[in-house]
Amino acid sequence: MSGYTPEEKLRLQQLRELRRRWLKDQELSPREPVLPPQRVSPVERFWNKFLQDGALWKNVIYKTYRHSIFAFTHVLIPVWIIHYYLKYHVTTKPYTIVEKKPRIFPGDTILETGEVIPPMKEFPDQHH
């Protein structure tokens, strides 16, 4: 026995018809695609109105604005964050912030200068 049975032939014919119909459905009509209206932010709306007449000086201002925003967000802010982290969180003594100064009492000697802290003055007329 060779060849397809009548049921198999019918099934293949139906599959071919389905494929043809599916391919035909994939073709777009002249009205398609229907795109939703594009949302424009207030800042973008301002720049669109500002640049409408095409004056050269307005274009220069816009390019300066765009480059400064890029520099601020991609250079300056990361540098500030790195500086803050290095200054306040990476502590390799003795070249960082002094977290707690040592207490000094009357009669103590300051090591760097050799100065002796004098005793506190007495104020007999004031009460604590």
From Swiss-Prot:
Alphabetical keyword list: Acetylation, Electron transport, Membrane, Mitochondrion, Mitochondrion inner membrane, Respiratory chain, Transmembrane, Transmembrane helix, Transport
Gene Ontology biological process terms in this record: mitochondrial ATP synthesis coupled electron transport; mitochondrial electron transport, NADH to ubiquinone
Membrane topology annotation: Single-pass membrane protein
Matches recorded under InterPro entries: NADH_DH_b-subcmplx_su6
Domain of life: Eukaryota
Pfam families documented for this protein: NDUF_B6 (PF09782)
Primary localization class, coarse: mitochondrion
The family this protein is said to belong to: Belongs to the complex I NDUFB6 subunit family.
Role this protein plays: Accessory subunit of the mitochondrial membrane respiratory chain NADH dehydrogenase (Complex I), that is believed not to be involved in catalysis. Complex I functions in the transfer of electrons from NADH to the respiratory chain. The immediate electron acceptor for the enzyme is believed to be ubiquinone.
Protein's UniProt name: NADH dehydrogenase [ubiquinone] 1 beta subcomplex subunit 6
Recorded name of the encoding gene: NDUFB6
